[in-house]
């Protein structure tokens, strides 16, 4: 089998077009663009090559990447990930195409926490990605559609406010049991994303792992869906097992936690590999916030 050819930079004319697109993007969104030091270096290498195309081995990356944060209103924003390609995507396919025509940018629209998944999927499917001005057209399209979506949500919320307060607005405390939750970054997401859903509680890693959430049923469901689909997207489905062990609801339920926090470091470790929280300390932690009676319900002890 013949060895695959190394990726080749785009033709000079196409690279100039991509450079202009990058400059336009930076000039139009100076405060909304996030770029890393490596992105700035990549742009500098591109400009150096365009100033002196005679370089035998240009130090061009495969692409230049940006994160674009678009404000819809003071409380809502969108995030787009944009890649401007600098190499030929497929040399063989490109032989019959216009060699000077640059590849279209790759635009990824990340689902914001305030938008439901179905709406996000519908918007992604209708993004004008095939246009030569796809970035600007996508920005305008998403701003317009998101503004309309938020207005619809606000109107629906006002109409259904009494019913929502009677059902979804009730505070509940839900206890989840996890076989294991050893990855620190995943636990950080559990803690850091909770305020977006007005949730309080705690997470305890190890075997067993315990997750306690205080908030409305709707917010807890949306939060758990977000954690599973985004934070845990790289985890095999059979390892995402999490079960609701106990739910406290009723007029008497009040928050006992002031925020969302991780308590793993506060519990001594036991077990053969030191990955199981000492149950005596866990029980005392429950009792310390007035929840000693639910200890057996949660852990089945």
From Swiss-Prot:
Q: Describe the task this protein carries out.
A: Part of the gene cluster that mediates the biosynthesis of the antihypercholesterolemic agents phomoidrides which are dimeric anhydrides. The function of phiF within the pathway has still to be determined. The pathway begins with the highly reducing polyketide synthase phiA that catalyzes the formation of a C12-fatty acyl-ACP, starting from one acetate and 5 malonate units. The hydrolase phiM is involved in the release of the C12-fatty acyl chain from phiA.
Can you name this protein? Phomoidride biosynthesis cluster protein F
- Free-text biotechnology note from the record: Phomoidrides A and B (also known as CP-225,917 and CP-263,114) are potent inhibitors of Ras farnesyltransferase and squalene synthase. CP-225,917 and CP-263,114 inhibit Ras farnesyl transferase from rat brain with IC(50) values of 6 uM and 20 uoM, respectively. CP-225,917 inhibits squalene synthase with an IC(50) value of 43 uM and CP-263,114 with an IC(50) of 160 uM.
Pfam families (UniProt xref):
Prp3_C
Q: What gene is this protein translated from?
A: phiF
- The source's superkingdom equals Eukaryota
Q: Which SUPFAM superfamilies match?
A: UBC-like
């Amino acid at each position: 089998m013949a060895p695959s050819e190394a990726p080749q930079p785009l033709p000079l004319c196409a690279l100039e077009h991509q450079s202009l697109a990058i400059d336009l993007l930076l000039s139009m969104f100076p405060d909304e663009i996030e770029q890393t030091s490596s992105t700035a270096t990549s742009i500098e290498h591109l400009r150096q090559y365009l100033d002196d195309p005679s370089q035998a081995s240009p130090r061009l990356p495969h692409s230049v990447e940006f994160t674009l944060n678009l404000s819809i209103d003071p409380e809502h924003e969108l995030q787009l990930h944009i890649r401007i390609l600098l190499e030929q995507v497929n040399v063989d396919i490109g032989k019959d195409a216009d060699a000077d025509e640059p590849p279209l940018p790759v635009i990824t629209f990340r689902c914001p926490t305030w938008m439901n998944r179905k709406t996000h999927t519908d918007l992604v499917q209708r993004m004008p990605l095939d246009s030569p001005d796809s970035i600007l057209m996508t920005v305008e399209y998403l701003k317009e559609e998101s503004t309309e979506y938020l207005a619809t949500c606000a109107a629906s919320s006002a109409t259904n406010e009494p019913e929502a307060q009677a059902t979804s607005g009730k505070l509940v405390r839900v206890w989840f049991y996890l076989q294991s939750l050893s990855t620190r970054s995943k636990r950080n997401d559990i803690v850091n994303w909770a305020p977006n859903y007005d949730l309080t509680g705690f997470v305890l890693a190890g075997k067993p792992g315990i997750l306690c959430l205080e908030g409305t049923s709707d917010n807890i469901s949306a939060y758990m869906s977000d954690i599973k689909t985004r934070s845990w997207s790289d985890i095999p489905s059979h390892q995402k097992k999490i079960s609701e062990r106990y739910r406290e609801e009723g007029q008497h339920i009040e928050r006992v936690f002031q925020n969302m926090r991780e308590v793993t470091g506060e519990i001594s470790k036991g077990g053969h590999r030191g990955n199981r929280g000492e149950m005596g300390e866990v029980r005392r932690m429950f009792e310390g916030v007035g929840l000693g009676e639910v200890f057996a319900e949660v852990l089945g002890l």
